[in-house]
Design a protein with these regions (language model features):
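Non-catalytic, beta-strand-enriched accessory regions in extracellular/secretory proteins
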Residues: 235-258
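Beta-sandwich interaction modules
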Residues: 252, 294-311
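Secretory targeting signatures
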Residues: 1-72, 192, 224, 280, ...
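Edge beta-strands of jelly-roll/beta-sandwich modules across compartments, strongly enriched
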Residues: 274-276, 323-337
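Short, surface-exposed beta-strand/strand-loop-strand elements in extracellular ectodomains
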Residues: 273-288
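Noncatalytic modules at the cell exterior or secretory-pathway interfaces
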Residues: 306-324
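Acidic, serine/threonine-rich low-complexity disordered tracts
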Residues: 51-109, 129-138, 142-240, 335
């Protein structure tokens, strides 16, 4: 009997040991599953916070309406700091285009002659592509996705772009050009346009900065756009003799004349006995719609204006005295478009 009890006790102990081992294995498996699930949940949480509170609407093509407006600060080497308002002036459903104008006619003229604001005029409805050399350029890449790469042409450069980051509805893009220029901008899906932009050349000189001050809707007033074509761009330096040059006004096309010509001047006259004069004359009637004279040490930085467009040759006559004296003259033809909202 004693032997039997001992054997039973031995069996029970063995059974308890097996059960304990099985239980520990079960609990260990459960713990591993729990940790694994916690890791998955943690990874999902981290992935969702990588883009902050960005929504799907922030990543897709924004919907523009007539009267939408963005007030920007522009900084350029020629003009320093200036604020201007970009406005959706028209929606052309027939050809799939927005017309983006500017609330200042002077700013529209600046764009015509120095092209310092690339986001004026025609903008495609299917991607907010802007036009350069008559072709739409995909500056933006909807729907936004981090890591995407693409190419476009803007500001006279061919760019390779990358979507670097997306956070709280703002998309950061960087691009480099074949000539070593750098471009970066932040696009806001919630504001429907660019928050900031910076363009620097291959020497690190910042050619353009844009910063959004305010987004609004329901603009009322006049809006302008000068669609331009370059006619003349030359830098003249000190010369003991009169300088003669010319440019031709052949109109926008054989069937359409320019509405006006826009000129730009950047002038420095030597402060040691320097002087200078400039005249632009119409060869047909002999009129001189633009005349300038500068004395010792004079400067005229980034001035601009308009003269009548007359088909044919325009003659340029300059005098420049002084070792460091120079005149930079640019002329563009422009078709003038305006809207009243």
């Amino acid at each position: 009997m004693a032997v039997y009890c001992s054997e039973q006790k031995t069996r029970m102990l063995k059974n308890d040991t097996v059960v304990g081992q099985n239980m520990r294995a079960y609990l260990l498996s459960l713990l591993m599953i729990t940790v694994s699930l916690a890791g998955c949940i943690s990874n999902e949480d981290n992935a969702s916070t990588d883009i902050g509170n960005t929504t799907e609407d922030d990543l897709v093509l924004p919907e523009w309406q007539i009267g939408d407006q963005w007030l920007y600060t522009f900084i350029t080497p020629q003009f320093g700091e200036d604020s201007t308002r970009l406005v959706v002036a028209d929606v052309r459903e027939d050809d799939g285009l927005f017309m983006l104008g500017i609330s200042s006619e002077g700013e529209a003229q600046r764009h015509a002659v120095i092209n310092h604001n690339p986001f004026l005029g025609r903008v495609t409805m299917d991607g907010l592509s802007v036009y350069e050399n008559g072709e739409p350029q995909p500056v933006f890449n909807f729907p936004w996705e981090a890591g995407n790469t693409w190419a476009f042409r803007l500001l006279g450069q061919d760019w390779s772009a990358t979507t670097d980051n997306i956070y709280n509805g703002e998309v950061t893009v960087s691009a480099s050009s074949t000539e070593g220029h750098q471009l970066s901008y932040v696009f806001s899906g919630r504001q429907g346009f660019i928050m900031s932009l910076l363009w620097a050349d291959n020497e690190g000189v910042v050619n353009l900065q844009m910063s959004l001050i305010q987004k609004d809707t329901g603009y009322t007033g006049d809006v302008f756009f000068y669609r331009a074509g370059d006619l003349h761009d030359n830098l003249y330096e000190e010369n003991d003799q009169e300088i003669y040059d010319s440019f031709f006004d052949e109109g926008y096309s054989p069937n359409e004349a320019w509405d006006t010509l826009v000129w730009y001047l950047d002038v420095e006259i030597d402060d040691k006995g320097g002087s200078g004069t400039l005249t632009i004359s119409d060869q047909q009637d002999g009129s001189s719609p633009l005349s300038r004279a500068w004395g010792n040490g004079a400067t005229e930085k980034g001035s601009f204006g308009t003269i009548p467009s007359k088909t044919g040759e325009h003659r340029i006559t300059l005098t420049l005295q002084g070792e460091t004296s120079f005149v930079h003259l640019k002329v563009a033809g422009a078709l003038v478009r305006s809207w009243t909202l």
